UniProtKB/Swiss-Prot annotation:
GO biological process: negative regulation of apoptotic process; positive regulation of transcription by RNA polymerase II
Signal peptide: none
Protein name: Prothymosin alpha-A
UniProt keyword list: Nucleus
Major site of localization recorded for this protein: nucleus
Species of provenance: Danio rerio (Zebrafish)
Gene it is expressed from: ptmaa
Acidic residues bias: start-end ranges: 39-78, 87-96
Length: 105
């Protein structure tokens, strides 16, 4: 396999593709689409951005859950009551629900 040549002349970098897209948009008049398809593509891009934001929020929630668990263990080690630890768990759940509601709106 070491003797096999790879033709890299056909490979296009992401930067080149982005520049090509910008040139095409300038030539075609991105702001004034001839048909509704161009507008739908723009909306599709916006939906993808929202999806990426939702993924980020989910990752943050996972990190927060890990930190909250450590706090509960510290209280138990200090001699805190089981009732207090249960109240803390309820607080963590309350913190998560508003975040989910914000992303749904």
């Amino acid at each position: 396999m070491a003797d096999t040549k790879v033709d890299t002349s056909k490979e296009v970098s992401a930067k080149d593709l982005k520049e090509k897209k910008q040139v095409e948009e300038a030539e075609n008049g991105k702001d004034a689409p001839a048909n509704g398809n161009a507008e739908n593509e723009e909306n599709g891009d916006q939906e993808n951005e929202v999806d990426e934001e939702d993924d980020d929020v989910a990752e943050e929630d996972e990190e927060d859950d890990g930190e909250g668990d450590d706090d509960d263990e510290d209280e138990e080690a200090e001699g805190g009551t089981g009732k207090r630890a249960a109240e803390d768990d309820d607080d963590d759940e309350d913190d998560v629900d508003p975040k989910k509601q914000k992303t749904d709106v």
